[in-house]
A protein has these predicted regions:
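Surface-exposed, low-hydrophobicity beta-strand/loop segments enriched in small/polar/acidic residues
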Residues: 1-306
Length: 306
């Protein structure tokens, strides 16, 4: 774990709060809200649900140590610990107003660098994002994988993806990468994007051979052929709306040892908004689930901006 300037709290959400935190007591509409999760409005204004990253704006994070413990004659609203969800209809302290540091939930498959902006995502989690043309790009790391590889990152259904931008940190001559969705089109976002030079990669959108263009079918409806004697093919970019259960981001690279970098899924939706900034550097983590290795969520210390 990298160094960060605050002490991780023990069975609490707040790591640092110099001023009074805005606390609203709301009702858990379902038993899915854990302390530290980003929440949004439920059915009514006094209901909350875990933010889904798509449908509604986030307005706070679920607290823990601020919750009412109740009395011997009544049931406590507070879960047993910060890893346990609030019961349905429990009163949840929703923290907001910014200016404090808290433990939030990082989505599976992603890591952070201290200082990263964090945006609301599915299941009350957050993801690291970078400003990109057309929106914020969710950063996903890649290395050499010669067969389709599940990144562990699941796009929330209904999310708009307008682009995928590759950043090469370790280039290899003639290396390429495909990016798509598991169980869907493995090169639906990018098809043979070059990784031969370090830095950000510009798409090949115009070529004498249509198959040399690098935007995939999710981001191009159809190529346009010019009327020139030596015809050129142009791939006009569009956007993809995530759905039909095809949500898991995957990639495949050429057989290029030492290849490494990141790609950025440029996303947009009403519920996809900046909610904080990472206070620590974390690598993606895995765990064994039902005898299989899977990427899992982890806590991340963050300055809260909502």
């Amino acid at each position: 774990m990298g160094y960060y300037g605050f002490v991780e709290p023990d069975n609490k959400v707040i790591a640092y709060a110099p001023n009074t935190i805005l606390i609203q007591e709301e009702k858990a509409e379902a038993a899915t809200i854990k302390p530290g999760m980003v929440v949004m409005k439920g059915t009514n204004d006094d209901d909350v649900v875990a933010c889904d990253g798509v449908t509604k704006a986030p307005f706070g994070i679920a607290g823990y140590e601020q919750s009412f413990l109740g009395a011997a004659s009544s049931t406590s609203n507070r879960p047993a610990n910060v890893d346990t969800a609030y019961a349905k209809d429990a009163r949840v302290p929703v923290l907001g107003g910014g200016g404090f540091v808290a433990m939030m939930h990082l989505a599976p498959g992603v890591g952070t660098v201290k200082g990263d902006l964090l945006a609301s995502w599915g299941g009350g989690t957050v993801v690291p994002v970078v400003p990109m043309p057309g929106g914020y790009g969710v950063r996903i790391p890649f290395v050499k994988k010669t067969t389709e590889f599940d990144t562990g990152v699941d796009l929330p259904e209904g999310m708009i993806v307008s682009d995928v931008i590759v950043e090469v940190t370790k280039e290899v001559a003639d290396a390429t990468i495909d990016v798509g969705l598991l169980g869907g089109d493995a090169d639906g976002f990018l098809d043979g994007e070059s990784c031969a030079a370090k830095g950000f990669v510009k798409h090949n959108l115009v070529d004498g051979t249509a198959t040399n263009n690098t935007l995939g079918a999710y981001l191009v409806e159809a190529d346009i052929k010019s009327a020139d004697t030596s015809a050129l093919f142009y791939s006009p970019p569009t956007f993809h709306v995530v759905g039909d259960g095809q949500v898991s981001v995957s990639y495949t690279t050429s057989d290029s040892t030492n290849l490494a970098g990141n790609f950025y899924m440029v996303c947009a939706a009403p519920g996809f908004q900046i909610v904080g900034r990472a206070e620590e550097t974390l690598a993606p983590v895995t765990a064994t689930v039902n005898d299989a290795t899977e990427f899992v969520s982890q806590n991340v210390m963050a300055r809260v901006y909502i």
